[in-house]
């Protein structure tokens, strides 16, 4: 379920420097990192269904073990309304990806073979103080920003045109998406 696919390319930097190997990877939906992201995303969606202004900072950790798989949910949530059943949301997200058999490391549908630990509390007052503002000026709390860069490496390929993305990353992501489609469609 969780394969890693890499694309490598030799680059010759300007200025006469020696060549360097540029590598990029993309993982499929069953990879532990993607599984954790999918579970956390499902929890965010469940909270936003209850309260469209909910603030959710939940981390997920998974571990397949011989005797029993493990999903750990930890974080803070602030919402007005009924608290979602975090365990059920996590189990369903893992099952949707395909973790439904103990033979592959985790059967998220069966509590006998998969333990879910929930350590989610109300958002701390210190973080809430930084984000509880009215109108347009709202703080970011403890959340960070990710960044990348745009380039023209994909512009000479019609099917990738307009992405302005590093070619190695675009190809590895495309391969991962196709493998996921093939797995899901059988």
Predicted regions and their residues:
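Short N-terminal amphipathic alpha-helices
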Residues: 48-62, 84-87, 102-105
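Glycine-rich, mobile lid/loop segments that gate access to catalytic sites or pores
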Residues: 23-27, 62-70, 95-186
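N-terminal low-complexity, intrinsically disordered segments
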Residues: 31-34, 86-87, 126-128
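Active-site-surrounding "flap" and adjacent substrate/cofactor-binding loops of secreted or lumenal enzymes
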Residues: 77-98
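N-terminal, positively charged regions that mediate nucleic acid binding
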Residues: 10, 14-57
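Short, charge-patterned binding micro-sites
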Residues: 58-80
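Short, small-residue-biased leader/transition segments that mark boundaries at the very start
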Residues: 1-5
